[in-house]
Amino acid sequence: MSISTKKVPKQNRRDLETTAKPRKKQTKTDFSEKLERGRKLYMLGNYSEAMEIWLPLAENGDCEAQAWVGSLYANGDGVDVNSKIAFEWYLKSAEGGNPQAQANIGALYAMGQGVQKDMVYAVKWMRRAARNGDPNAQFNMAVFYAKGDGVKQSLIKAAEWYRKCAENGHYPSQGRLGHMYYVGEGVKKDRIEAYLWLSLAGQHGIGSALIELEKVVGEMSSDEKSAAMQLVDIWRSRGNDNSSPKVFSPIPS
């Protein structure tokens, strides 16, 4: 069979050129709008609908959507709990640079959920997330150093990580740091600092902080109380409040 060499009319060529154009690519704005729509559905408890929005984005390489899909599987929201699938999605997101996913990969390695327990990898990913500013990762690094879990035990380094996190408004870290200042673990004993951090933690429902705060107050002089209350007022005026999206829980100590 011979191949026709007949020229295509100009009008037909224009039609061919038009239909051959690629579809318009989704912009970052499109992705952001879809992610936000998914978040709103998630907050309303419409997990399955959120998954329908996030999954295509995740499969297309969006690391934030990948983290959300991982969270759905980790927590069993709209799907059956599956730590293995959660780990796979978190890993994709973590490798793409998402700090929360990096923290969750570290937590899964530490607890042996969805992957074989490996404290070397747990510390590696947790440290990366902590350095990228994730509060749960910073808290967990403090726990690792306080317990000597996967790292050489160091109360000094534990206090340093608790402080990084506490200064960004992480309430449990504020409570831990306040305790360390009260008893002098990893830091020099300081009732004013203890009062500051225990007060900030206590006002957000950390019961153990309130109990210990009473002990601190009972040992303080009038001048110490005055200085401590002024310091608390300064910190409250800053409005530091770290309320990150729902992710895997911090590792219990």
Regions found by a protein language model. Name each.
Residues 67-68, 103-104, 119, 139-140, ...:
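Alpha-solenoid helical repeat scaffolds
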Residues 34-36, 40-41, 53-57, 68-75, ...:
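Hydrophobic face of amphipathic alpha-helices that form TPR/SEL1-like repeat modules
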Residues 20-33:
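TPR-adjacent "capping" and linker segments in tetratricopeptide-repeat scaffold/adaptor proteins
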Residues 2-23, 208-253:
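Terminal, low-structured helical/coil segments at or just beyond the last alpha-helical repeat
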Residues 29-30, 42-45, 59-63, 75-77, ...:
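Short helix-capping/linker turns of helical repeat alpha-solenoids
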